[in-house]
Amino acid sequence: MSVVIRPAKTTDIKAIRQIIDMYTLQRRLLAKETVTLYEDVQEFVVAELDGKIIGCGALHVLWEDLGEVRTVAVIEEHRGKKIGHEILTTIIERAKKLGLKRLFCLTFETKFFAGHGFKEITGAPVEPEVYQELLLSYDEGIAEFLDLESVKPNTLGNTRMLLHL
């Protein structure tokens, strides 16, 4: 069978949790609480092969024209088979359909994202008034996007990248 990229369902969260945990142990993804995964299930797509979830990725809308690619990961035995590329391509298409103009990511996998047109940036690519509004969010990912001191230990070594759609 071939790999199917589809929207995640609540029944996929346990598999998504396992994939994230594998990468968290390697310090390649930030840990996420299970409750957060359920709250954000509608943001996720999964890669499914023969009924098994083998990869995931999420699109989080930050502002009117800006989204963030989060948690793109594929289980080890299926890495190198372009599944991550299929996941990211699906996320990019979802972003375009939503009317987003830019996608942000915070990553160690710079070559992977550069292969899709992402460019390295510094700082938060938003106007000062939008920055102030984003400060009101409780989402830790937005704190990472804003490069706040409180989350710097979590993001050390990551590269900030941006794609113009």
Predicted segments — roles?
Residues 97, 101, 107-135:
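Conserved active-site alpha-helix within GNAT-family acetyltransferase domains
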Residues 31-44, 49, 55-74:
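A conserved beta-strand-loop-helix scaffold within acyl/acetyltransferase catalytic domains
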Residues 80-93, 104-105:
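Conserved acetyl-CoA-binding loop-helix of GNAT-fold acetyltransferases
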Residues 72-79, 108:
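A short, internal acetyl-CoA/4′-phosphopantetheine-binding micro-motif in the GNAT/acyltransferase core
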Residues 126-165:
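C-terminal "cap" of GNAT-fold acetyltransferases
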Residues 1-31, 48, 157-165:
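Short amphipathic alpha-helix that is part of the acyltransferase structural core
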